[in-house]
Amino acid sequence: MTIHFYTFSNVRGGSSRQRAFRISEELERRGFSTIIHTPPVVDIARTPWPKKFRLIIQILRTLPSIKKDDIVFLQRAIYSKYFFVIMVLYLSLTRRRMIFDIDDPLYLHSFTKTKVFTQMATAVITCSHGEMEWAKKYNAQVSCIHIALTMSDYEKFSNPHEQKNTPVTIGWIGTGPEHIENLKVLAGIFARLARTHGEAFRFVLIGALGDSRVYDIFNTIANLEVSFIDTLDWANPESAPREIQKFDIGVLPHQTDGEWNKAKTSFKILEYMACAVPTIVSSFGEMPYIITDGENGFIAENEDDWVEKLERLIADDALRARIGRAGQERVREAYSFDATIPQYIKVIES
């Protein structure tokens, strides 16, 4: 049996890297045969004609390699109508087993394609409980398996909590231009903190990508010391944890309104926690399943809550160490590949 992955993007895309390429590697280590087919679906969608025709032919040529007992694994593969039609026809004619993986509430903007793949799937894997509840309307075989990470890549960059940093470093990492509205959540919080604790903390934002909108959110806040790192080598598994290790506090501001946010989750929260960095998150989506407030992290319900919990962490070295270590243990037990790959294997073998 071989598992045939068709992915949203190449390995440089975070979703496909963690939900397909890394899964493939981990399954191979455990004796499974896997293959990742190219081109990625998003390349088909974005490539103009007549070059698009060549990519479609490439996909068609992969289909004869899928044998009777093999499994087709579609990772977020809804972004090309041509790929969608090809795969629907192929699966309908051959009755091959198919696993459909979604890590965002894709049904909110691509309802029909997401619904059809969900209905056709032998099994569906979602990344949040909100997505799982939606998928269960159309398929009984649904598992919630959260995006995971390789724990060893992060543990060696654990924040040691051995010395007091002055000022305390509050950090955020991500693709800044994609999170403008989420980052704006921090603006009012930092403005209040900077008025009373301006010399006690600094802010580091990784992933600004040279976008002036990201810079402007924070450069206008009086008394706020802020540093921007435009980009990292995201394909290098050590680049992010090496920088996160320097954070004393990790923050994940996020909008909370709307169906999209109710079903969302985050990878960066796991990266903070895996490096033993105490974390504060907005109350959205999957966060209450990951964090127990006050035990392995903090969940902030509103701006006042953010300010109060940041003040506590800024002032208390021992609290930062305790929360950071508890968060790291939480990721090790539930959100590392050692924890999630057995769940994938159970789906594959069922």
Regions found by a protein language model. Give the residues of each.
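Short acidic/histidine- and often glycine-rich active-site loop of Leloir-type glycosyltransferases
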Residues: 262-263, 283-294, 298-299
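A short, well-ordered alpha-helix in the C-terminal region of glycosyltransferases
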Residues: 312, 319-334, 343-346
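Conserved acidic donor-binding segment of nucleotide-sugar-dependent glycosyltransferases
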Residues: 293-304, 312-318
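Nucleotide-activated donor-binding/catalytic signature segment of Leloir-type glycosyltransferases, i.e.
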Residues: 207, 215-245, 249
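Conserved donor-binding/catalytic core segment of Leloir-type glycosyltransferases
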Residues: 4-5, 162-191, 203-204
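Short hydrophobic beta-strand element within catalytic cores of glycosyltransferases
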Residues: 250-252, 271-274, 278-281
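Acidic anion/phosphate-binding donor-loop and adjacent secondary structure
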Residues: 108, 149-167, 181, 350
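A short, active-site helix/loop in glycosyltransferases that binds the activated sugar's phosphate group
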Residues: 108-110, 114-142, 151-156
